[in-house]
């Protein structure tokens, strides 16, 4: 059997996807399924004074119209069960249609259920809602009196202070810069829009086909909301058409689909429209970040101050921890201060979006480092090397398997960085301005709870199950590769099943935790399997392992267990099962949340090098070349790992150059509500992207040695592009996206 972890493998689900056989959540065929259409508020704050649904109810095919006047109350889960890794998250603290209050424009105020989507949409347009509007808070300035400084975010400290920052910033002998960087609202727009099909069987059993990153979380939230036993709620989601965070929590359409089906007495599908993705499925909050840096003339940082301001909603707390997840850990400095300020406003709740905190945080910090390098007349790579942190700057413990220096070196070599002329506007390709920029990438290594079930059959095939997810990342393939190696069977003999709440516990597919977390559960289950086989073998007089101690036995070759000290004394899985008269054997592992390792810090690292070209007469930025070198521990699947980094870079190009959601200051509604106005990168915008990896497996982090790769690719890339734009033009744009009007 050839090595299964590491080599490039075609995706095991690839054929299903390209032939259209893969079923996404709203594609399941459910008999007599009706359609739900949501009605939105057109004010940002106030109360509903009246709702007229008579015309809507008169539309042929309408089965029910739900409003706050006729919708039963939902039940909230206890906070300790709802928040956190095991219980799921509701993105709004309020439940839909349970009161007359309006907290943001686009809030769902009614649900129409009809036999066809056309009937539901027509009826929805006939619902008349009267309001008593109030003055909304829509900006940081308007909500200044409501400012909050949260101490923690998901148990992570976000207000950080080390050393005397004030003294360093006042020291006249130091070189200093202070600048403010702005990122706009960015909206989730995966290929697959969010959606749910709800099917009741009586009053006590509910099945949801839901586009989610967390089937177990949805199961818990929905079971509590409807007062059901957990095992009576099934969540099914075998495929996800992209998520990036927007499907990690439970949004209001999920609960409305279930309630609509309950009241209408038929299955109901609610498919969030592209338009409603801009109000009902989450966004990255806008940020305003002020960076102050002080360094000696040879480039040694003496102080870093990172003050972040972000928005959240009045119905759900979300903190985009920009500084805590970048400045708090990236560079060595005797003085570091990170402050996070959050303003509650009347917009829908922000949510996780690929590298929440790290993505905007690294943009600001890495641009500030570039500006400092110019003030010092120092190469940007040399400045970063001068301040490389072997230990965590605020926890003072060593980083495990950190190879950032090698990433800088290899990236610079592949890119040809040594040929860079540091002077702005000094490099050209004919009449076109050429700019080269770089930045550091980073993302934490996360571990959560998980369980895995393995069924080994006598024909040397195995099925592995976990209620985890494949968001399009290649998880099916990676988990099959891990299972193949850990169990000891050929890749083709493994079937990995996921995406059902019936399976053993799987964590949210977020925080780049899945490979390490689920991989650890698979490792544990494989160990239990080998032990179970050993227990059969040592009791079997026909086995070469008869009467030996099970603790002395391990997997010694593919499909065989044997003595640790003498691999020649071994027995085949298939033979053990056949002699025992068993067609199969089944085991299940349970991995609890690991205790914090206070002796080491676990973080992934990388370096982006970027080239841009800009016609000075029409200053549109074209990214023409990117080299990204990553240090993420063991590479489980070379092909999908490369794709994940490339995808992060592409998303970062959108962040840097095109993506922005604008709001009407009068209504609070987003003005950009489709892909014609909200510009994501297309093939024409994406350059050659070279991806490479450095470092060794991080076995101190988990027994697989792998750290996640889903999010690190987007960190730092927007800064690398912005730095390249400055190098090309001599103009520093500090508010994203970098559109042509900002370069004129």
Which stretches of residues belong to each language-model region?
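C-terminal catalytic domains of large/alpha subunits in multi-subunit enzymes
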Residues: 59, 69, 227-232, 262-270, ...
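Thiamine diphosphate
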Residues: 230, 239, 243-265, 269-271, ...
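Glycine-rich loop/linker segments at domain edges
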Residues: 7, 13-19, 80, 86-88, ...
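Short, aliphatic-rich beta-strand segments
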Residues: 36, 206-210, 461-466, 623-625
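Extended active-site and interfacial segments that coordinate phosphate-rich ligands
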Residues: 12-16, 125-138, 213, 220, ...
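Helix-loop-helix junctions that connect adjacent transmembrane helices in secondary transporters/permeases
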Residues: 145-226, 388-461, 671-682, 687-693
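Flexible, low-hydrophobicity surface segments
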Residues: 1-156, 179, 253
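Short acidic, glycine/serine/threonine-rich loops at helix termini
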Residues: 75-80, 123-126, 210-211, 219-221, ...
């Amino acid at each position: 059997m050839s090595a299964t972890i590491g080599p490039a493998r075609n995706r095991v689900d690839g054929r299903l996807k390209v032939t259209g056989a893969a079923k996404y959540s709203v594609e399941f065929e459910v008999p007599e399924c009706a359609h739900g259409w949501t009605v939105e508020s057109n004010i940002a704050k106030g109360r509903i004074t009246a709702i007229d649904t008579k015309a809507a109810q008169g539309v042929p095919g309408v089965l029910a119209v739900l409003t706050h006047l006729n919708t039963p109350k939902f039940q909230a889960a206890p906070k300790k069960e709802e928040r956190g890794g095991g219980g799921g998250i509701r993105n709004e603290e309020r439940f839909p249609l349970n009161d007359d209050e309006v907290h943001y424009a686009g809030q769902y105020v009614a649900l129409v259920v009809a036999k066809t989507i056309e009937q539901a949409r027509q009826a929805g347009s006939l619902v008349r809602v009267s309001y008593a509007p109030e003055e909304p808070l829509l900006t940081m300035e308007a909500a200044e009196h409501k400012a909050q400084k949260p101490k923690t975010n998901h148990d992570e400290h976000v207000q950080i202070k080390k050393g005397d920052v004030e003294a360093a910033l006042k020291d006249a002998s130091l070189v200093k810069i202070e600048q403010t960087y702005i990122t706009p609202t960015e909206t989730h727009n995966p290929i697959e829009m969010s959606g749910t099909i709800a099917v009741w069987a009586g009053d006590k059993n509910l099945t949801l086909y839901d586009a989610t990153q967390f089937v177990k979380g949805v199961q818990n939230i929905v079971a509590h909301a409807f007062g059901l036993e957990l095992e009576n709620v099934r969540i099914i989601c075998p495929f996800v058409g992209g998520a990036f965070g927007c499907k990690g929590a439970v949004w209001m359409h999920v609960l409305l689909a279930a309630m609509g089906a309950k009241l209408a007495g038929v299955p109901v599908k609610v498919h969030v429209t592209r338009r409603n993705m801009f109000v009902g499925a989450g966004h990255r909050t806008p940020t305003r970040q002020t960076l102050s840096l002080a360094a000696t003339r040879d480039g040694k940082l003496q102080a870093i101050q990172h003050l972040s301001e972000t928005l959240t909603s009045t119905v759900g707390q979300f903190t985009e921890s920009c500084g805590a997840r970048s400045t708090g850990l990236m560079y060595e400095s005797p003085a570091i201060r990170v402050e996070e300020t959050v303003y509650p406003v009347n917009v829908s709740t922000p949510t996780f979006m690929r590298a929440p905190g790290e993505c905007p945080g690294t943009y600001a910090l890495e641009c500030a480092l570039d500006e400092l390098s110019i003030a010092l007349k120092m190469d940007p790579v040399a400045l970063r090397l001068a301040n490389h942190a072997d230990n965590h700057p605020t926890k003072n413990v060593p980083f495990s398997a950190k190879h950032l220096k090698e990433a800088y070196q290899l990236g610079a070599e592949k890119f040809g960085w040594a040929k860079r002329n540091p002077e702005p506007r000094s490099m050209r390709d004919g009449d076109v301005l050429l700019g080269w920029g770089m930045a550091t990438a980073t993302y934490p290594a996360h571990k959560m709870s998980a369980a895995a079930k393995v069924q080994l059959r006598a024909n040397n095939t195995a099925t592995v199950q976990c209620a985890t997810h494949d968001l399009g990342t290649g998880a099916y393939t990676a988990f099959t590769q891990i299972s193949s190696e850990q169990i000891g069977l050929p890749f083709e003999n493994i079937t990995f099943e996921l995406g059902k709440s019936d399976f053993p516990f799987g964590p949210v597919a977020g925080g780049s935790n899945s490979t390490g977390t689920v991989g650890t559960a698979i490792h544990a289950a494989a160990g239990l399997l080998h032990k179970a086989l050993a227990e059969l073998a040592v009791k079997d007089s026909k086995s070469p392992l008869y009467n030996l101690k099970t603790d002395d036995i391990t997997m010694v070759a593919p499909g065989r267990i044997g003595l640790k000290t003498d691999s020649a004394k071994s027995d085949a899985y298939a033979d053990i099962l056949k002699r025992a008269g068993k067609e199969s054997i089944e085991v299940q592992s349970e991995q609890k949340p690991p205790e914090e390792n206070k002796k080491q810090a676990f973080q992934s690292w990388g370096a982006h090098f970027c080239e841009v070209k800009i016609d000075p007469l029409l200053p549109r930025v074209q990214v023409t070349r990117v080299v990204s070198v990553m240090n993420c521990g063991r590479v489980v699947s070379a092909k999908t790992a490369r794709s994940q980094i490339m995808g992060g870079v592409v998303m970062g190009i959108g962040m840097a150059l095109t993506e922005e959601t604008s709001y009407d200051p009068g209504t609070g509604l987003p003005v950009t509500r489709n892909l014609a106005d909200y510009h994501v990168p297309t093939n024409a915008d994406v350059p050659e992207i070279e991806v490479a990896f450095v470092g060794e497996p991080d076995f101190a982090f988990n027994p697989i040695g792998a750290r996640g790769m889903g999010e690190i690719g987007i960190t730092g890339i927007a800064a690398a592009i912005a730095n390249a734009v400055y190098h090309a033009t001599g103009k520093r744009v500090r508010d994203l996206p970098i559109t042509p009007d900002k370069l004129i």
